[in-house]
Curated annotation (Swiss-Prot):
InterPro entries: DUF4529
Sequence segments annotated as region (Disordered): 136-157
A single cellular component GO annotation: cytosol
Pfam families named in the record: DUF4529
Organism, as annotated: Rattus norvegicus
Protein name, per record: Uncharacterized protein C16orf46 homolog
Family matches, as PANTHER family: CHROMOSOME 16 OPEN READING FRAME 46
Length: 406
């Protein structure tokens, strides 16, 4: 009996040992060290960071609402993206404005203060009032009659404000104003002006054509120079009839003056009348001719063209009839200085060392020389109005609300 009890206790102890060994091996298999636990936690943290990055990339393409989200997400979205409001804006009627068609706060703020659609009959009155306002704001010295009956409606087109005309069923665009100011008159052909005078602007089709014409003329920098050639020819003909002298007389005067004073200034008699005549004849040849081939006049024209920025072929080509001579240029400069100082300085400084035989001159030439003894200044009549460009200024005003967009 004792042997049987010992064997049973031995077997029970073995089984208990096996169970304890199995539990210890299971514990050591699941968590053998602390390093494995740390590695497992690091893997979980890495997965969470990856998910956060993916969520952030997905939110970059969404347009956020609110002021802070708009400021933070402005670099993520395009600069032309619209900020949409959460509240539902009521739908407007057709042709009422841009607020009914879209709920964009930025577009709604731009469209505030725009013109309401008005009939075409009232548009003409608005244009006339705008012409009066523009003419009152100008501070130029030119006094012109913009609303004179001689000018047709086509000539007053550049002075009007371009108010947009809306048709039925068409939505209103942003407020756009075009201020077109003209210092000089536009060169309009006679056929167009006669047609404009015969057909007054009363129908709706002509109102639309006026706005189109203003829009096309806003792109033109310089007016057409069609009437400039006629005025230039008439000016040259008048100047030839009044001031032109034959080449023989001019050459004779130059020869006499060069023979009289080759090195220094040589006066004539002590009376001073012939000195006045020489001074006036030289100034008449140099300063009064429309386009002479001398040095002083071309210098004035080049300075005037550089001041006005006129890149046209106004200056004539150099001709070989009058070759430049340094003695003549020096003599001209001294004569101009003498003409400015007066007749007394002419008598004192133009004293001859060698006597010169008196020459007979007609009386009417002497009287003209006395009247024109002063140097002739370049007048503005040399350049007619069609040659000068008219200044056009086009400006587009888009009103933006100053309040913060929410």
């Amino acid at each position: 009996m004792d042997l049987c009890e010992e064997s049973e206790t031995f077997l029970e102890n073995k089984e208990n040992k096996k169970i304890e060994d199995a539990e210890e091996t299971a514990l050591t298999f699941h968590c053998p060290d602390e390093r494995s636990e740390r590695n497992h936690v690091c893997c979980l943290l890495g997965v969470s960071e990856l998910t956060l990055e993916e969520d952030g990339r997905a939110s970059e393409f969404t347009i956020s609402t609110g002021w802070e989200e708009a400021v933070h997400g402005w670099g993520r979205t395009s600069p032309t993206a619209c900020i949409w409001s959460k509240k539902k804006v009521r739908r407007g009627r057709v042709g009422e404005g841009t607020s009914g068609g879209s709920n964009c706060l930025f577009c709604m703020s731009l469209s505030q203060g725009s013109l309401e659609p008005r009939p075409l009959s009232a548009a003409g009155k608005l244009e006339e009032a705008a012409v009066a306002e523009v003419s009152s704001q100008k501070n130029w010295g030119s006094e012109k009659n913009w609303n004179s009956p001689s000018q047709g409606p086509a000539s007053r087109e550049p002075n009007k404000l371009c108010f947009p005309t809306y048709l039925h069923g068409e939505k209103k665009s942003l407020q756009m104003k075009e201020f077109i100011w003209c210092m000089e008159e536009w060169g309009i052909p006679e056929a167009v002006s006669s047609k404009a005078c015969r057909n007054p602007s009363s129908s709706t089709d002509q109102g639309l054509s006026i706005s189109d014409a203003v829009a096309t003329k806003a792109l033109v920098v310089l007016p057409p120079l069609k009437s400039s050639s006629h005025n230039l020819d008439s000016l040259s003909k008048k100047s030839r009839n009044i001031f032109w002298q034959p080449e023989e007389k001019v050459l004779g005067v130059e020869k006499d003056e060069c023979m009289a004073c080759p090195d220094e200034l040589k006066g004539v008699d002590g009376k001073g009348e012939k000195a006045h005549f020489e001074l006036a004849s030289r100034l008449k040849v140099t300063n009064i001719l429309p386009f002479p081939p001398t040095v002083t006049r071309t210098h004035l024209l080049s300075a005037e063209s550089q001041r006005c920025c006129l890149h046209w072929s106004l200056l004539p080509q150099k001709s070989s009839v009058f070759p430049p001579n340094p003695t003549n240029i020096h003599y001209l400069a001294t004569l101009q200085v003498l003409g400015q100082q007066g007749g007394q300085n002419c008598r004192t400084r133009l004293k001859a060392k060698e006597a010169k035989p008196p020459r007979t001159t007609p009386k009417h030439i002497v009287t003209e020389a006395k009247q024109e003894s002063r140097p002739h200044v370049l007048e503005s009549k040399v350049f007619p109005k069609p040659l000068l460009p008219s200044l056009t200024v086009s400006r587009v005003v888009i009103p933006v609300s100053t309040h913060r967009v929410l």
